[in-house]
Amino acid sequence: MDRIVEIEKVSFESEYEVTLRPLTFEEYIGQEKIKSNLKVFIKAAKKRLESLDHVLFYGPPGLGKTTLAHIIANEMGANIKISSAPMIEKSGDLAAILTNLEEGDVLFIDEIHRLSPAIEEVLYSAMEDFRLDIIIGSGPAAQTIKIDIPKFTLIGATTRAGMISAPLRDRFGMQFRLQFYTDNELARIISIAASKLGKNSTKEASLEIAKRSRGTPRIALRLLKRIRDFAEVSDENSISKDRAKSSLDSLGVNDLGFDEMDLKYLDILVGSKRALGLSTIAAALSEDEGTVEDVIEPYLLSNGYIERTAKGRILSFKSYSVFGITPPMHITEEKQNKGLFNE
């Protein structure tokens, strides 16, 4: 699926994102409660001359989990080693990573929910006792070799917290769910990023981009980069609201942040006039269920455009109202009943 509002990280963006990445909590915009708590925990760990307890970040992609990991390492004065679960295929792969860590290092594992059970088993003793238990051989002749490793901080990131096994999840002393960003927070991020890219973005332009960025910094920065291209081709030194609007319209992103895939998803529900299961929607979109559930639906759910029910996905009353469609009778009655209880 090729979308300008795609949330997953695109390979060519890695270097681009690094140049715009904040290095401290003061530079990091948004996630205020998480930042506040982390500041306390980091200060306490440094005061005790200890490594920070293990941290788990979860939530939709593109909200800053990797950036927060880098900031934690920076605030702790530690080196950070980056890996991802799909790259750790064997116990030996994990052992090689852990034995090469230095005292106080931060190990960041992205997509940690994809670790195999065998890898998780090795990780348990490493997280709790800073020791590797390596089994040599098999059967009655098998032996366990214990290897001490430096004390370190594991930071795990996942978009699917429910897929992490309970034993692994319980070993993270700190667990934080990242929230979608407000338009004002995104507008500030966009203005700062535009300056770093050599373009001034007016307050109105930044807010226009923010409104169409689905509450996600990664999308906001991607849209900004494309709008900058339009501005440069037109020899414009700054990004105005009109430039932002026309560029976003050209990119097929409407004023609600919807692209063609979102509209197709919603159109499927409109046409069905009943609840649809995830597999049915995925088949209609020609996408896998994981992409629909992790990439398309989070924004629609968090903003109240769709609802999950026991029977499946349905359009919310808000969607019928936004798109000027008369809702089915049962939706109208449900809305009226909610209103009675809220009075």
UniProtKB/Swiss-Prot annotation:
BP GO annotations: DNA recombination; DNA repair
What does the function comment of this entry state? The RuvA-RuvB-RuvC complex processes Holliday junction (HJ) DNA during genetic recombination and DNA repair, while the RuvA-RuvB complex plays an important role in the rescue of blocked DNA replication forks via replication fork reversal (RFR). RuvA specifically binds to HJ cruciform DNA, conferring on it an open structure. The RuvB hexamer acts as an ATP-dependent pump, pulling dsDNA into and through the RuvAB complex. RuvB forms 2 homohexamers on either side of HJ DNA bound by 1 or 2 RuvA tetramers; 4 subunits per hexamer contact DNA at a time.
Q: Which protein are we looking at?
A: Holliday junction branch migration complex subunit RuvB
Q: Which residues lie within the region annotated Large ATPase domain (RuvB-L)?
A: 1-181
Subunit structure and binding partners: Homohexamer. Forms an RuvA(8)-RuvB(12)-Holliday junction (HJ) complex. HJ DNA is sandwiched between 2 RuvA tetramers; dsDNA enters through RuvA and exits via RuvB. An RuvB hexamer assembles on each DNA strand where it exits the tetramer. Each RuvB hexamer is contacted by two RuvA subunits (via domain III) on 2 adjacent RuvB subunits; this complex drives branch migration. In the full resolvosome a probable DNA-RuvA(4)-RuvB(12)-RuvC(2) complex forms which resolves the HJ.
- Does the UniProt entry include the keyword NADP? no
Q: Where is this region: Small ATPAse domain (RuvB-S)?
A: 182-252
The text of the family note is:
Belongs to the RuvB family.
EC code: 3.6.4.-
Q: What class of enzyme is it?
A: hydrolase
Residues holding Mg(2+) = T66
Q: Name one Pfam family in it.
A: RuvB_C
* Segments of this protein annotated with the region Head domain (RuvB-H): 255-343
Q: What domain comment accompanies this record? A: Has 3 domains, the large (RuvB-L) and small ATPase (RuvB-S) domains and the C-terminal head (RuvB-H) domain. The head domain binds DNA, while the ATPase domains jointly bind ATP, ADP or are empty depending on the state of the subunit in the translocation cycle. During a single DNA translocation step the structure of each domain remains the same, but their relative positions change.
This protein's GO cellular component annotations are:
cytoplasm; Holliday junction resolvase complex
Kindly list the positions annotated as binding ATP: L20, R21, G62, K65, T66, T67, E128, D129, F130, R171, Y181, R218
Q: Name one GO molecular function term.
A: ATP hydrolysis activity
Q: What keywords sit in the KW lines?
A: ATP-binding, Cytoplasm, DNA damage, DNA recombination, DNA repair, DNA-binding, Hydrolase, Nucleotide-binding
Subcellular localization(s) per the UniProt record: Cytoplasm
Q: Which reaction does it catalyse?
A: ATP + H2O = ADP + phosphate + H(+)
Please list the residues that bind DNA.
Answer: R308, R313
